[in-house]
Amino acid sequence: MRTKQPSQKEIAVKVGDDYKKYDRLLKKVAGIKTDWKHSKRSGWFQTGDIKKKRIYYFFPEEGGFKFTMVFSDKAIQLIKEENISDMVIQALESAKKYHEGTPFDLNAAEFEVKLVESLIAIKLQSMK
């Protein structure tokens, strides 16, 4: 059953201290437009768009969150060229590829604002 959209405070309480990392990202990256959506499978989740282009998905969980980005082949090539992170490259190489791209997930413990900023910049560059 679909419930009403959660408030920022409710999400912060559910996620816990790690919510501060996500909030920092929202304040650091210019132009992110967020929108709450609901699905039967995932419950409430937030999307992040820049200039009407989907950049990420944020799934709040009890005591943490999952942050997902979907990368095109072009973006993955740029990530490899920039040598962003071995962990990111290995995860993308082992992830299942879909028509819309290759998903990459970070949990709250793995989420680093600087890393995600770099991934967002590469994703935007690959969409030009």
Predicted regions and their residues:
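Short, conserved beta-strand/beta-arch hydrophobic-aromatic motifs that form part
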Residues: S39-E100
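Intrinsic-disorder-associated interaction segments
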Residues: K4, V15-D18, E81, A109, ...
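Charge-rich, low-complexity N-terminal segments
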Residues: M1-R41, F45-Q46, Q90
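Short, Lys/Arg-enriched charge-dense amphipathic segments
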Residues: M1, Y57-F71, N107-A109, A121-K128
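Well-ordered alpha/beta subsegment
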Residues: L92-K128
